[in-house]
Amino acid sequence: MDMAMSSRLALCLAVVAACAAGGAVADWSPATATFYGGSDGSGTMGGACGYGNLYDQGYGVDNAALSQALFNDGASCGQCYLIVCDTSRAPQWCKAGTAVTVTATNLCPPNWALPSDGGGWCNPPRPHFDMSQPAWEQIGVYQAGIVPVLYQRVRCWRQGGVRFTVAGLNYFELVLITNVAGSGSVASAWIKGTNTGWIQMSRNWGANWQSLAGLAGQALSFAVTTTGGQYLQFQDVAPAWWQFGQTFSTYQQFDY
């Protein structure tokens, strides 16, 4: 069996194994992948989605910064992607038969000083994943630096329920929505106080949603629609004595 045929066979096996593991049904798309954040992934904490400490939020080190073409101004925050290294294009740099699922937690910004095929990997319209090093090394050989990949969105699995962190000041509420399963990302969100109806929030940045309702002293409820189209209400999540900076966990979770 020649090298080309071996590479194609390895890729087929990796894709089959990945689909079986991730329950994926969508088509595969080509992209490229690099890594950042150090061997322990600590440099990936924070990021343009606003998740902060990814260990505390339940996302861990299997995460990635998305190129501008994939990030969608923060609407992709929390989405999960199944990624395999394309052995048909770089057999010497791929770990055959492997796959990894990563969560979108950051933006890989464009680098206009470099060409898209010569260092400006995240320049539009390129689909690119700048993965945590531990995640990337599950599919690629360290010395490569960059590898061709195939990817698709898959369902996110999370432990526990959806969480809401309420920041802000006075009449301004900034709500970070985390630990979202199913499609992983939020399409729209609402907030409600004890004495109000549902008030639609707008995306401030990343996974942070804002309201100018001034709801201090009222118990807070939330409603969320995921990008998969599932709508859930989370009643009386925060008691009337809530304080800015607190995080509130729920027992509800999304399926899609």
Curated annotation (Swiss-Prot):
GO terms for cellular component: extracellular region; membrane. May cause loosening and extension of plant cell walls by disrupting non-covalent bonding between cellulose microfibrils and matrix glucans. No enzymatic activity has been found. May be required for rapid internodal elongation in deepwater rice during submergence. Residues 171-250 form the Expansin-like CBD domain. It comes from Oryza sativa subsp. japonica (Rice). This is Expansin-A31. Residues 46-161 form the Expansin-like EG45 domain. Keywords: Cell wall, Cell wall biogenesis/degradation, Membrane, Secreted, Signal. It is found in: Secreted, Cell wall; Membrane. Its main location: secreted.
